């Protein structure tokens, strides 16, 4: 068996990254914002610590 050189298509990988990373970031930040909004709705003033 001969060794087959690994072909790396960097442009394809680059475009795949930029098509998936923003989608994952959008979902993550949307869920985080929704969680904080609901947390503040059910437990008001828990994010504010008066001294």
UniProtKB/Swiss-Prot annotation:
Keywords: Membrane, Photosynthesis, Photosystem I, Thylakoid, Transmembrane, Transmembrane helix
Subcellular location(s) of the protein: Cellular thylakoid membrane
GO cellular component: a single term: photosystem I
Membrane topology: Single-pass membrane protein
GO biological process: photosynthesis
Matching SUPFAM superfamilies: Subunit IX of photosystem I reaction centre, PsaJ
Gene3D superfamilies: Single helix bin (1.20.5.510)
Keyword Transcription: no
Membrane-spanning ranges: 17-37
InterPro entries: PSI_PsaJ (IPR002615), PSI_PsaJ_sf (IPR036062)
Main location: membrane
The keyword Phosphoprotein is assigned to this record: no
HAMAP family reported for this sequence: PSI_PsaJ (MF_00522)
Its biological purpose: May help in the organization of the PsaE and PsaF subunits.
Family to which the UniProt record says this protein belongs: Belongs to the PsaJ family.
Protein name, as recorded: Photosystem I reaction center subunit IX
Gene: psaJ
């Amino acid at each position: 068996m001969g060794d087959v050189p690994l072909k790396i298509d960097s442009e394809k990988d680059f475009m795949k990254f930029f098509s998936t990373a923003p989608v994952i970031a959008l979902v993550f930040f949307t869920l985080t914002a929704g969680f904080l909004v609901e947390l503040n709705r059910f437990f008001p003033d828990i994010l504010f610590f008066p001294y």
